[in-house]
């Protein structure tokens, strides 16, 4: 019985430390140092939450930039069903999905003469990716500009403004946050695209 007391005391101490003190401390420090990130990186426009800077949204109208396909099953970009498709590169079903996406993208972007960017045809590992490469965003500029009746140069400038570059090249590649970019397009014109 005497041998159980130190084990029980240690267990109780570690339970309080890892189950109480540590979570409360990290939550408090996160709220203090990084309040925007700790609260989900929510994007507010007109006192309404429009989305998160970390989770993509399904944009299908011609006047919006389209993000990567979502791998979430029934509802695109459903964070509760996050995950990849788990289809191997050699799987014929994945090939059929990619071919269908390429055909749909070609039909929606007849002005684009170059190859369809890979990230517009394949889902990310989470299925919720909100970022595209600047090249994939640039590929869509003619369609978005035509749908919104804006000069191509103005839309290209907006893409350049919303291109986030890493602090150093070895820390990643430049990305365009599609949610932020589409909200900026709406703000530019004062309405939502159809």
Swiss-Prot record:
Its main location: membrane. It is found in: Cell inner membrane. The keyword Transcription regulation does not apply. InterPro entries: KdpC. The chain crosses the membrane at residues 12-34. Keywords: ATP-binding, Cell inner membrane, Cell membrane, Ion transport, Membrane, Nucleotide-binding, Potassium, Potassium transport, Transmembrane, Transmembrane helix, Transport. The keyword Transmembrane helix applies. One of its GO terms (cellular component) is plasma membrane. It is a single-pass membrane protein. It holds the Pfam family KdpC. GO terms for molecular function: ATP binding; P-type potassium transmembrane transporter activity. Part of the high-affinity ATP-driven potassium transport (or Kdp) system, which catalyzes the hydrolysis of ATP coupled with the electrogenic transport of potassium into the cytoplasm. This subunit acts as a catalytic chaperone that increases the ATP-binding affinity of the ATP-hydrolyzing subunit KdpB by the formation of a transient KdpB/KdpC/ATP ternary complex. Belongs to the KdpC family. The system is composed of three essential subunits: KdpA, KdpB and KdpC. This is Potassium-transporting ATPase KdpC subunit. It comes from Salmonella choleraesuis (strain SC-B67). The gene is kdpC.
């Amino acid at each position: 019985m005497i041998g159980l007391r130190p084990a029980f005391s240690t267990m109780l101490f570690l339970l309080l430390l890892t189950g109480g003190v540590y979570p409360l401390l990290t939550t408090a420090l996160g709220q203090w140092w990084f309040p925007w990130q700790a609260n989900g990186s929510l994007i507010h426009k007109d006192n309404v939450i429009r989305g998160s800077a970390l989770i993509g949204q399904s944009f299908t109208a011609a006047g919006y930039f389209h993000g990567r396909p979502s791998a979430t099953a029934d509802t695109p970009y459903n964070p509760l069903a996050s995950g990849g498709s788990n289809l191997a590169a050699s799987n014929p079903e994945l090939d059929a999905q990619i071919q269908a996406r390429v055909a749909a993208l070609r039909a929606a972007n007849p002005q684009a003469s170059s190859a369809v960017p890979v990230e517009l045809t394949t889902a990310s590992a989470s299925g919720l990716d909100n970022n595209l490469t600047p090249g994939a965003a640039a590929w869509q500029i003619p369609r978005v500009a035509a749908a919104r009746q804006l000069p191509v140069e103005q839309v290209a400038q907006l893409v350049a403004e919303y291109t986030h570059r890493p602090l150093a090249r070895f820390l990643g590649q430049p990305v365009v946050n599609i949610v932020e970019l589409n909200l900026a397009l709406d703000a530019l014109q004062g309405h939502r695209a159809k």
